[in-house]
Amino acid sequence: MKYCSQCGSEIELRVPAGDDRARHVCDVCGTVHYQNPKLVVGCIPEWEDKILLCRRAIEPRYGLWTLPAGFMENGETSQQGAARETLEEARARVEVNELYSLFNLPHINQVYLLFRSRLLDLDFAPGEESLDVRLFSESEIPWSEMAFPVIKETLSLYFRDRANGGGALRSGDIVRTGGDLRRYKI
């Protein structure tokens, strides 16, 4: 960032008074430009004993499988964002139910919120960001072709909870440790 979005003046990267980290600061108008984590919202779309996955048509992780999810937009709730992302990526309409998982990914400044959801019908197809969209039972899931560790972790917990009759909110941190991604419970 080079210029202030409020007044157009050049900005400086420094620690503002009363803060503990460097921020982009405009000395002309006093605006402090904060850069905060992004919220990623998505669904675990269920149909009978199967869930809907999307094969990515974009980078990162082109060609790998994921749940329909993406960045939350201004002016929408997390549930609305999850439903919108499912419609965009899988052309699927869902009833968004309870929040299933919340994972912090501090190494990429993201927070994932994934909701259990019910497919309203079997009318789905790849959206612009998907190569393919399919329903999978647990035994059919291409575990070695999952796009992101957070999705693989969420699905592992989901199927374990479903088999055991559990369903409490799952939360944790997925952090990079020496090139490895590991999950730690909060």
Feature-to-residue mapping (PLM):
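Active-site donor-binding loop signature of nucleotide-sugar glycosyltransferases
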Residues: V28, R56, A69, S117, ...
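Acidic, metal-coordinating catalytic segment for phosphate/diphosphate chemistry
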Residues: M1-G42
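Short, highly charged C-terminal tails/helix-capping segments
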Residues: S171-G178
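Nucleotide phosphate-binding site architecture
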Residues: S5, E12, D27, L52, ...
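Conserved hydrophobic/aromatic beta-strand scaffold that supports enzyme active sites
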Residues: Y3, R23, I44, L53, ...
